[in-house]
């Protein structure tokens, strides 16, 4: 309903849900519509294109993109594969390794493997050397992530991560840490890199509260809205030109390797002493669509949205020019026999 257009209503989800209507999305001869449920169905809205601005499982991980693909609706951003790869921290690292892209040393395992041979898993983790970062493999927003300095902390952190996922990843923590983010806009054919930001925090990593509720103690203070758009940052990042350009090139390599589209944000970890750069992870639907990075790159928010939508329309048209299936009925000559294979001797 109209209440969904009032951002203040999102402060109270229970009230919002009471007044909102459930709808379905359908495609009728190329016309995309939202329709109410129930006996007397009415068209709520006609759609030209969908702009997903969502977080979490079943949203960023390719699920909602798969639903939109099934319905046939054009949408902004990365497709099913890119979205799912961008959500699985283990698979994405395996891809980066195959392309010699820089990542921190890590080990991963399933929860059942940990319970079957806890000592062996702990032994592998110890070889990385403390401090370590323990993460659920498929969650974002820093949920379930723990920074650990010893064996006891490691075991507790693994137990915590298992509450959120069946697959766990343990990474060597980067010391002398500088956190830098770069947004990328484009598709597999062309990529633009934004101005870099340096994220300021006294914690080992940004928490969920830092990212979405604007909490946590930081070294600098800023004004603005809550969440990632108001996280304390320095723009542009305080890096030399060579390092800045290297980060931008790696960001574009990541974007292309995962077949991303639209706008994303690639998060980096830099060792301030050695100046080594490591890919942390991509965010296929970044908080605030990283508009603040593009504004710093002389691309206003309205222009960013226009370019994202233009890319989506182009991608939709290109896809429908490809041949993905052949119209044939393999059962047309079926007569109860075992078919061709059944006749072979």
Please tell me what each predicted stretch does.
Residues 74-75, 103, 132, 301:
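Hydrophobic beta-strand scaffold residues
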Residues 100, 228, 232-345:
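ATP-dependent carboxylate activation and anion-phosphoryl transfer catalytic cores
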Residues 146-226, 238-246, 277:
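Phosphate-binding site of ATP-dependent enzymes
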Residues 37-44, 83-177, 188-189:
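Active-site nucleotide/adenylate-binding loops and adjacent lid/helix of ATP-dependent enzymes
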Residues 1, 186-189, 271-274:
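Short acidic-glycine loop/turn motifs at beta-strand connectors
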Residues 1-81, 85-91, 110-120, 324, ...:
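ATP-binding N-terminal substructure of ATP-dependent carboxylate-amine bond-forming enzymes
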């Amino acid at each position: 309903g109209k209440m969904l257009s009032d951002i203040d209503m999102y402060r109270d989800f229970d009230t919002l849900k009471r007044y909102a209507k459930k709808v379905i999305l359908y495609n009728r001869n190329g016309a995309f519509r939202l329709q109410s449920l129930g006996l007397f169905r009415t068209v709520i809205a006609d759609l030209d294109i969908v702009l997903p601005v969502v977080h979490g499982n079943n949203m960023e991980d390719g699920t909602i993109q798969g639903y939109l693909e099934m319905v046939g609706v054009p949408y902004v951003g990365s497709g099913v594969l890119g979205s799912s790869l961008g959500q699985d921290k283990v698979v994405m690292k395996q891809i980066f390794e195959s392309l010699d892209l820089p990542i921190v040393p890590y080990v991963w395992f399933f929860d059942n493997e940990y319970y079957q041979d806890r000592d062996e898993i702990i032994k592998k983790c110890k070889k990385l050397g403390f401090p370590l970062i323990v993460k659920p493999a498929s969650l974002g927003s820093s949920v379930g992530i723990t920074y650990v300095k010893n064996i006891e902390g490691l075991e507790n952190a693994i137990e915590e991560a298992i509450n959120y996922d069946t697959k766990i990843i343990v990474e060597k923590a980067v010391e002398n840490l500088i956190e830098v983010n770069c947004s990328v806009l484009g598709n597999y054919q062309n990529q633009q890199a934004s101005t870099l930001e340096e994220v300021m925090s006294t914690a080992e990593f940004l928490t969920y509260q830092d990212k979405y509720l604007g909490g946590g103690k930081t070294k600098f203070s800023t004004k603005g809205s809550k969440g990632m758009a108001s996280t304390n940052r320095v723009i542009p990042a305080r890096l030399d030109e060579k390092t800045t350009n290297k980060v931008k090139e790696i960001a574009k390599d990541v974007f292309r390797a995962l077949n991303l589209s639209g706008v994303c944000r690639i998060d980096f970890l830099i060792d301030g002493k050695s100046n080594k750069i490591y890919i942390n992870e991509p965010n296929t639907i970044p908080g605030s669509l990283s508009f603040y990075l593009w504004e710093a790159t002389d691309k206003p928010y309205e222009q960013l949205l226009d370019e994202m939508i233009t890319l989506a329309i182009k991608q939709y048209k290109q896809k429908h020019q490809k041949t993905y299936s052949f119209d044939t009925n393999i059962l047309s000559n079926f007569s109860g026999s075992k078919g061709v294979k059944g006749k072979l001797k």
